[in-house]
């Protein structure tokens, strides 16, 4: 969805392209606030469902801007003109040319999105009630908060019990970041290329 939106906004023949881009940027500068967001999710019937964690993060305006900049800088207009002469339409050009040439930025967006969702617990905190739907990070937060309260309430500072609590805390944190450590090496080369998009000229 992000790449499709970025491709549409990169086309000069799109009517109202500047106004649409400004509308997208406006939502990034000024958010509606937490209460309207909560009411919207509730009225859409996504409260206490996993969709409340998935749908709000489907499109990120910053990612759209990054992808649009990448498309404008890596895919020249002459390439589309040559493809259109051969009878290639917008959607086919997107699938055959834009997607293959955008692999580095796609890898970066996937990594940013994965890290953002993996580290997020706030949406689950306000939208999810059932324990079987709660993500790992919410359990980790609840454990860390409860263990800190227990530490402060203990009058007798038992060194051994405090050491065990710290060990459990660190183990949970390590387990929570382990999937990202496993995932990152496979897309590291694309990540470096994507981050350097637009940084080197000449």
Question: What are these language model-derived features?
Answer:
Residues 1-202:
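A hydrophobic, multi-pass inner-membrane permease signature
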């Amino acid at each position: 969805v992000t790449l499709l939106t970025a491709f549409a906004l990169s086309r000069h023949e799109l009517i109202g392209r500047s106004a649409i881009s400004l509308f997208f940027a406006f939502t990034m500068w000024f958010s509606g606030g937490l209460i309207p967001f909560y009411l919207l999710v509730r009225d859409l019937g996504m409260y206490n469902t996993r969709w409340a964690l998935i749908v709000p993060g489907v499109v990120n305006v910053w990612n759209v801007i990054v992808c649009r900049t990448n498309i404008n800088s890596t895919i020249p207009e002459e390439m589309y003109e040559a493809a259109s002469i051969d009878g290639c339409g917008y959607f086919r050009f997107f699938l055959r040319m834009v997607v293959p040439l955008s692999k580095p930025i796609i890898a970066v967006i996937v990594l940013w999105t994965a890290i953002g969702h993996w580290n997020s617990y706030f949406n689950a905190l306000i939208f999810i009630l059932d324990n079987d739907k709660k993500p790992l990070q919410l359990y980790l937060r609840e454990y860390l908060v409860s263990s800190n309260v227990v530490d402060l309430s203990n009058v007798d500072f038992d060194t051994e019990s405090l050491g065990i609590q710290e060990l459990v805390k660190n183990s949970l944190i390590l387990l929570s970041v382990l999937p990202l450590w496993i995932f990152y090496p496979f897309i590291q080369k694309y990540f470096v290329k994507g981050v350097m998009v637009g940084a080197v000229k000449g």
